C-alpha cells in the first residue's frame, strides 16, 4: 500500500501552529522545531499505515476516528478513507488538575 493523500483540517493546523509558537516562546526554537517535525513525521507515518492508531471513542459523528501518540504530550486525531488521511485535531494528553 502506498501513502494516502494527507489533508490537515484547519482546526488541527491551528493547534500545531499555536503549540509550536508556545514551545518557541516558553522553551526555545529548537524545542519548537522538534515538536513540529515530530508531528509532521508522525503524520507521514500514518499516511502509510493508518491502521496503527487506536479507535478514539471521544469523537462522535458519522466517521470512525482514531488517535495516535505523536509526542509525549500530544495525540493526533484522524480518520481515513481508501485514498485520504484526514488530520482532524491535535489533542493535549496532559492530565488537568
Model-assigned labels for residue ranges:
Residues 1-38:
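Arg/Lys-rich, positively charged N-terminal/basic patches that mediate binding to nucleic acids
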Residues 2, 64, 83-86:
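Residue-level signal for beta-strand positions within conserved beta-sheet cores that form or flank
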Residues 5-10, 20-21, 40, 49-56, ...:
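Alpha-helical transmembrane segments and membrane-interface helix-loop junctions
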Residues 43-44, 88:
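A short hydrophobic/aromatic micro-motif that marks alpha-helical segments and, especially, helix-coil
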Residues 44-70:
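A short, surface-exposed loop/turn module that caps and links secondary-structure elements
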Residues 70-75, 79-97:
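Enriched for short, Lys/Arg-rich terminal
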